[in-house]
C-alpha cells in the first residue's frame, strides 16, 4: 500500500456493499490487485524523501511508484553501462567476461526490470508525471521515452506516436493501426510471426506517414528526427565500443519489438467479431494475475482502453 492510499478495509467494504451479487467475486479478486503488495519499485527511498518527491515533484502524488521505477531503471543502466565501458576492451572480441556481463545485463534488464519499465513507460506516456511547475518538466517527462526506452528496444521518440496517437486513436483496427490484431488469425503462431515482422519492418516509415495523414506534422517531424538520432547513436556507440553496443542496445533492439508485439497480440487476442471497435469486445481484463503487481495493474486492459490516463 502506498503513501496516499485510502484505508483499504473501509474502501473494500464500500465496494463490496455496492457490488451486485453476480459481481461480488470479481470485486473480491480486484481488491487483491488494488491493495496487494506492490512490486514495481524494488528500490525504495526513505519515507520522508518519497513523500517530498510525491508532493513537490509529481503532477499527481499517486504516481510515485512510476517515478521510483524510472529511478531504479536509470540507476541500473548507468551501472551496467559503466561496467561494460570500463571492464571490456574497446577492441576486444568475444570473451568470458563479455559473455558474463551480457548475461547479467539481460537478466536484470529484461527478466527483472523489463515488465516494470515497459509498463511504467506505457502509463507515463498517457499521463503528466512531473508537475509543469517544476523547471525542466517537459524534458524530465520525455526522458523515459527519449533515453531509457532505447535500452528496451524502443527507438527514441516513437512510442508516444505509436501507442497513444495511433493505437488508441485507431483502437486496434487494422489498417490504420499498424499494431491492430483484428485482421489476423489470433490462434496461429505463424500469424503472430507475421504480425511481429510486419510491425518491425514497417513501423519506421508508417508512423511518420500516419502522423502526416492525421495532420500531426510536428509529431511527424519529431519522429523522423528522433529516428535519425537513434540510428546515429547506434552507429557512434558501435564504432566506439562494439561490445557495449551489443550488450546494451543491439540485443534489445531485436528482443524489444518482439516482446512488445507479442504482448499486444495477447492483449488483443480475443475480439468480438460483431463489434471489433467496442472497448469491451477488443481486449480483456485479467483479474488477480500475478504480473499485475509488477506492471501497475496492466492486466486491466479494458479499463485502460476506456480511460487511458487512469492506472487501474
Language-model-derived ranges and their functions:
Residues 106, 252, 288-289:
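Hydrophobic alpha-helical segments with strong N-terminal bias
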Residues 111-120, 249, 265, 297, ...:
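Short alpha-helical catalytic segment bearing the HExxH-like zincin motif
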Residues 115, 158, 260-261, 290-298:
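A generic hydrophobic-helix recognition signal that picks specific residues
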Residues 265-309:
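Cytosolic/matrix-facing juxtamembrane and C-terminal tails of multi-pass cellular membrane proteins
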Amino acid at each position: 500500500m502506498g503513501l496516499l492510499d485510502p484505508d483499504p478495509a473501509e474502501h473494500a467494504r464500500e465496494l463490496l456493499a455496492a457490488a451486485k451479487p453476480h459481481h461480488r467475486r470479481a470485486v473480491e479478486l480486484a481488491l487483491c490487485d488494488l491493495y496487494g503488495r506492490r512490486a514495481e519499485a524494488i528500490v525504495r527511498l526513505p519515507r520522508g524523501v518519497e513523500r517530498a518527491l510525491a508532493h513537490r515533484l509529481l503532477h499527481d502524488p499517486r504516481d510515485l511508484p512510476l517515478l521510483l521505477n524510472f529511478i531504479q531503471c536509470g540507476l541500473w543502466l548507468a551501472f551496467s553501462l559503466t561496467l561494460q565501458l570500463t571492464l571490456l576492451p574497446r577492441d576486444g572480441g568475444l570473451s568470458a567476461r563479455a559473455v558474463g556481463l551480457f548475461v547479467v545485463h539481460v537478466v536484470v534488464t529484461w527478466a527483472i526490470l523489463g515488465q516494470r519499465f515497459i509498463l511504467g513507460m506505457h502509463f507515463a506516456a498517457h499521463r503528466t508525471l512531473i508537475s509543469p511547475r517544476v523547471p525542466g518538466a517537459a524534458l524530465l517527462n520525455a526522458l523515459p521515452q527519449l533515453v531509457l526506452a532505447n535500452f528496451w528496444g524502443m527507438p527514441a521518440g516513437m512510442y508516444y506516436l505509436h501507442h497513444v496517437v495511433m493505437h488508441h486513436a485507431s483502437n486496434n483496427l487494422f489498417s490504420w493501426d499498424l499494431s491492430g490484431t483484428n485482421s489476423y488469425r489470433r490462434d496461429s503462431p505463424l500469424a503472430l510471426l507475421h504480425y511481429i515482422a510486419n510491425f518491425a519492418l514497417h513501423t519506421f516509415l508508417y508512423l511518420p506517414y500516419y502522423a502526416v495523414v492525421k495532420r500531426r506534422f510536428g509529431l511527424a517531424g519529431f519522429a523522423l528526427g528522433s529516428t535519425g538520432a537513434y540510428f546515429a547513436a547506434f552507429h557512434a556507440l558501435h564504432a566506439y565500443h562494439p561490445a557495449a553496443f551489443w550488450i546494451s542496445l543491439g540485443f534489445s533492439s531485436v528482443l524489444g519489438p518482439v516482446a512488445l508485439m507479442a504482448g499486444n497480440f495477447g492483449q488483443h487476442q480475443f475480439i468480438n467479431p460483431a463489434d471489433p471497435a467496442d472497448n469491451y469486445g477488443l481486449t480483456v481484463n485479467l483479474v488477480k494475475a500475478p504480473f499485475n503487481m509488477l506492471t501497475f495493474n496492466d492486466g486491466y486492459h479494458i479499463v485502460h482502453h476506456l480511460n487511458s490516463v487512469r492506472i487501474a
